[in-house]
């Protein structure tokens, strides 16, 4: 485990409850996590501790932050290993660092496939990164966070936890587990720790790099663009939701459709969503619908 530290600075801005707080963000090297790091620092004067595995990307983030890099430090480790979280907690405690907010954002999206085509190794890896990393982080961090007067935990789940579609069995299961656990922990620590749950829909980040998009048709591309949310907007929505201390945050056109559809129409929403994907012939779902 490696830690690169920078001097903490200050900035002037309108106060909100997490201004100038110390925030831990996992999955900080790209996508939503990277966006959160930059916004929390630039707009709220937060001191951010980023966690990721890719040192090259973390160094690039430091460069992007420019003179704001003094607000940033990072640790390099695999969030799916519980011992890494123990070492992390021990290290920041020994350094006298008091974190206020933990944002569990790290996650992976397995290639869309039929359940029977996943190996047990694929399944275990998805559950470890998407679910157990949250378990391990909160297990060691909650006692530390309770020492803060502005304690908060934000777990990033997915719209897949709201409505499962064909090809996402493992991903949906891992994110649904995060959702259920978060909702329970919220009640257990109500009044002591703000606990927020984020269920983002399709977001234009590199989490889809495992998916084989192939040569999508114009209709398919337009459909993806129509339901996808830019990373910048998603980050803005999440930070705004945290500012308002929202309990459940469902962001993105597709996520809201899946959430509302499940509430009013139950499992029919999963059936309709899967049927639409099948009919538009998205290449990234070819192993789900167009192979044995």
Predicted regions and their residues:
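Conserved glycine-rich cofactor-binding loop
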Residues: 29-30
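Conserved glycine-rich Rossmann-like NAD(P)H-binding loop of the short-chain dehydrogenase/reductase
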Residues: 45-60
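The beta1-alpha1 cofactor-binding region of Rossmann-like NAD(H)/NADP(H)-dependent oxidoreductases
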Residues: 55-56, 76-87, 120
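Substrate-binding pocket helix/loop in short-chain dehydrogenase/reductase
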Residues: 113-115, 119-124
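Active-site helix of classical SDR
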Residues: 138, 174
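Residue(s) in the substrate-gating loop at a strand-loop-helix junction
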Residues: 158
């Amino acid at each position: 485990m490696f830690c690169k530290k920078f001097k903490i600075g200050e900035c002037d801005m309108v106060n909100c409850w997490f201004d100038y707080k110390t925030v831990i963000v996992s999955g900080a090297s790209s996508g939503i996590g990277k966006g959160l790091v930059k916004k929390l620092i630039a707009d709220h004067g937060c001191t951010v501790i980023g966690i990721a595995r890719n040192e090259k990307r973390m160094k690039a983030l430091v460069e992007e932050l420019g003179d704001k890099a003094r607000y940033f430090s990072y640790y390099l480790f695999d969030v799916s290993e519980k011992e890494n979280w123990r070492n992390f907690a021990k290290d920041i405690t020994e350094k006298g660092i008091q974190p206020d907010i933990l944002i569990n954002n790290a996650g992976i999206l397995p290639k869309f496939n039929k359940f029977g085509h996943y190996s047990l190794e694929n399944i275990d890896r998805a559950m470890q990164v998407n679910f157990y990393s949250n378990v391990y982080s909160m297990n060691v961090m909650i006692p530390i966070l309770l020492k803060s007067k502005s304690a908060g935990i934000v777990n990033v789940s997915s719209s897949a936890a709201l409505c499962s579609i064909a090809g996402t069995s493992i991903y949906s299961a891992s994110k649904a587990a995060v959702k259920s656990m978060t909702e329970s922990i919220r009640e257990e620590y109500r009044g002591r720790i703000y606990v927020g749950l984020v269920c983002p829909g399709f977001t234009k980040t590199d989490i889809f790099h495992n998916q084989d998009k192939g040569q999508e048709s114009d209709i398919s591309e337009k459909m993806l663009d129509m339901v996808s949310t830019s990373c910048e907007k998603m980050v803005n929505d999440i930070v705004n939701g945290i500012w308002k201390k929202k309990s459940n945050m469902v962001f993105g056109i597709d996520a809201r459709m899946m959430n509302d559809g499940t509430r009013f129409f139950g499992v029919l929403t999963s059936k309709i969503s899967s049927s639409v994907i099948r009919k538009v012939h998205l290449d990234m779902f070819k192993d789900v619908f167009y192979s044995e």
